[in-house]
Amino acid sequence: MKNNHLEIRTISLEKNLGFAGGYNEGLKQINAEYFVIVNSDIEVTKNWIPPLIEVLKNNNSISAIQPKILSLTNKDHFEYAGAAGGFIDLLAYPFCRGRVFNHVELDEKQYNTYSEIFWASGACMAIKSKDFNVVGGFDKDFFAHMEEIDLCWRLKNLGKHIFYTSESTVYHYGGGTLEYSSPKKTYLNYRNNLWMIHKNFKGKIPLLLFIVIRIFLDQISGLKLLLSGDLKGCLSIVKAHFSYIISIGELNFKRKQYSKLNFHDLKGYTNKSAIWNYFFLKRKTFSEIKGK
């Protein structure tokens, strides 16, 4: 790229900092009012940026906005990583309008809206640079996966809002950097989810009890993987739990820092359990679980 595209500025890092650290370092070099974050496996459409910037420009309280994210390989379906905007359930499990766990919906314009969400996908979002920097950007310790949910949660605790618009559409290949079945992806997802909860959760029940419930449910998930023959996936969950435990000191420090951001806006949070609805009540879509 350096030899053939001299017009493109490149930034060389000494080691792989992952999605979170890599973006932080790159965005430090940019002096702009807005950042547009786009994964390398995204295919954009014509005039997709203006609808995003227009929303940010005209709304002081909105920090970030996500376009509609459809699958690059199955273009009439939503894509796993973001779909039509992210939410979290009663136990802080992330899911999306258009994608609940592994069930991905056909795009029938059912989510052609301008709506508030809990988190915008790291695969593609626009965000105000000032707000990004105020909350410290992505948590580099996450490396990859759920760092955007953690970021949006901190922004919401600052009193800001996260939105989705269907006026902009992109296509995402998904799993282009790390396959969905990768043990490393499993490890990062489970570890980072616990980290995110420890840093940001403020609820009616004590944090410790909340974490114990989540670890118990994680272990059930690990047992399911083991019984299906996925030993590596099961061990990845065990490893994630150990990593969480040895990180508690650092997480407590971060939690104390972020406790100053005490607005605790939970729009985009649902008091329903996605697990109960999906696995026991067989409700597979966002509308069935939360309502439109």
What annotation goes with each model-predicted range?
Residues 158-273:
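Active-site-adjacent helix/loop segment of glycosyltransferases
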Residues 90-96, 101-127, 149-151, 178-180:
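A recurrent flexible, glycine/aromatic-enriched loop bordering the glycosyltransferase active site
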Residues 43-93:
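Conserved donor NDP-sugar-binding/catalytic core segment of glycosyltransferases
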Residues 1-12:
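Acidic donor-binding segment of Leloir-type glycosyltransferases
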Residues 112-169:
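A short, conserved alpha-helix in the catalytic core of glycosyltransferases
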